[in-house]
From Swiss-Prot:
It catalyses: Preferential cleavage where P1', P2' and P3' are hydrophobic residues. SMART domains: HX, ZnMc. It holds the Pfam family Hemopexin. The active site is at E219. Its main location: secreted. The gene is MMP3. This is Stromelysin-1. It comes from Equus caballus.
Length: 477
């Protein structure tokens, strides 16, 4: 019996260790899930992986807050039980922040009649049921727009509809039953516009499995150019809503506003009487927004939005709503001047830098940062530089390009110093950009240079201008 206490101690130690090990495994699993979720849907760069395990790390807390806010959760910045539960839910595979492909500008079809083709079928549903649900899903969008659709049975359609499993040729493999249900691509040639459905799911016509009509209507919204909505009642909300049966597949006002901002309302029926009415006065900024001669003082991104500055105002544009808001600069940042010269965002620092004359300011969200304004010469400019015409931050290289008349400088954001060997001639390294610049910014890997009422889309890898557009083309004018 002398060994009994030892055996009891061993038993206590083993029994006590088990729940601790299990808890540690659960936490590791949640951390892996968080990293995967943020990388897939919230544009978490691979260089940020090292911070994921440090849950109190500033950048990771901000990403968790961003996710919680987007999905309508309580914003805590912590990996709480509600957040973990949501990350386990079935959803669309299209990112909530960031995008599958690099495409410039605002994605929309340039025509109103589109073709679609059902390339193959799931074994879960009869073929005529799939045909009927795809037709119904397109009809939902057709009823509120000028768009019409016709089916083709061979060749390349605008929208190719496919069932697939795991790796299926687009570098975004499915993950088996649950989690990612489907994904779709924005309007454009090739694979763009196509919708892919995970055939490992159990597709149904009712709510007993994954309702195909509900998911198809959502994915085809992406095929028409819509992004995810933060409105939990919207069809374009990213999470699969198990409470919505086939009878409840309908558009919210948020969905209607989004799609009509791209294509407008449906044409009036010739048989419908039109009641005379007094014309409504235009909203502030509307006429100026679509003025063909419109130019901008400065442009910058801000947490996924784009800010277009003009005089003492700015337009605030998001990729989810596509309808720009119009505000006085002072309503968000009272100390900022009007008539801004240049602006750019350093995403890794969550800061936007605003330039006017020989001074610059820093803002974070709607907060102005202490210690500003500072002189532009603290960045390393020579005394001869009196003002900045435009600036672009290259996220991939972590460099900022400053454009002054016909020259440019490059600033290393990591080292916080101007690089040697500058200035250089703009025309030499940016062929085709030979006008004096008013504004510039980066979007989806392209640089956009603005001069007067024109903008030049520039591919920095190919070093060439790819499109010349009106400056206000971002406003869907």
């Amino acid at each position: 019996m002398k060994n009994l206490p030892i055996l009891l101690l061993l038993c206590v130690a083993a029994c006590s260790a088990y729940p601790l090990d299990r808890s540690a495994r659960d936490e590791d699993s949640n951390m892996d899930l968080l990293q995967d979720y943020l990388e897939k849907y919230y544009d978490l760069g691979k260089e940020m992986r090292q911070y994921v395990r440090r849950k109190d790390s500033g950048p990771i807390v901000k990403k968790i807050q961003e996710m919680q806010k987007f999905l309508g959760l309580k914003v805590t910045g912590k990996l709480d039980s509600d957040t973990v539960e949501v990350m386990h839910k079935s959803r669309c595979g299209v990112p909530d922040v960031g995008h599958f492909t690099t495409f410039p500008g605002m994605p929309k079809w340039s025509k109103t009649h589109l073709t679609y083709r059902i390339v193959n079928y799931t074994q879960d549903l009869p073929r005529d049921a799939v045909d009927s649900d795809v037709e119904k899903a397109l009809k939902i969008w057709e009823e509120v727009t000028p768009l019409t659709f016709s089916r083709i049975y061979e060749g390349e359609a605008d929208i190719m509809i496919t069932f697939a499993v795991r790796e299926h040729g687009d570098f975004f493999p499915f993950d088996g039953p649950g989690k990612v249900l489907a994904h779709a691509y924005p309007p454009g040639p090739g694979m763009n516009g196509d919708a892919h459905f995970d055939d490992d799911e159990h597709w149904t016509k009712d709510a007993s499995g994954i309702n195909f009509l509900l998911v198809a209507a959502h994915e085809l919204g992406h095929s028409l150019g819509l992004y995810h909505s933060t409105n939990t009642e919207a069809l374009m909300y990213p999470l699969y809503n198990t409470l919505k049966g086939p009878a409840r597949v309908r558009l919210s006002q948020d969905d209607v506003t989004g799609i009509q901002s791209l294509y407008g309302p449906p044409p009036a029926s010739p048989d419908s009487p039109v009641e005379p009415s007094e014309p409504e006065p235009p909203a502030p900024g509307t006429l100026a927004m679509c003025d063909p001669a419109l130019s901008f003082d400065a442009i910058s991104t801000l947490r996924g939005e784009i800010l277009f500055f003009k005089d003492r105002y700015f337009w605030r544009k998001t990729f989810r709503t596509l309808v720009p808001e119009f505000h006085p600069i002072s309503s968000f940042w009272p100390s900022l001047p009007s008539g801004i010269d240049a602006a750019y965002e350093v995403t890794s620092r969550d800061s936007v830098f605003i330039f006017k004359g020989n001074k610059f300011w820093a803002i974070r969200g709607n907060e102005e940062q202490a210690g500003y304004p500072r002189g532009i010469h603290t960045l390393g400019f020579p005394p001869t530089v009196r003002k900045i015409d435009a600036a672009i931050f290259d996220k991939e290289k972590q460099k900022t390009y400053f454009f002054v008349e016909d020259k440019y400088w490059r600033f290393d954001e990591k080292r916080q110093s101007m690089e040697p060997g500058y200035p250089k001639q703009i025309a030499e390294d940016f062929p085709g950009i030979d006008s004096k610049l008013d504004a510039a910014f980066e979007s989806f890997g392209f640089f956009y240079f603005f001069s007067g009422s024109s903008q030049f889309e520039f591919d920095p890898n190919a070093k060439k201008v790819t499109h010349v557009l009106k400056s206000n083309s971002w406003f869907n004018c």
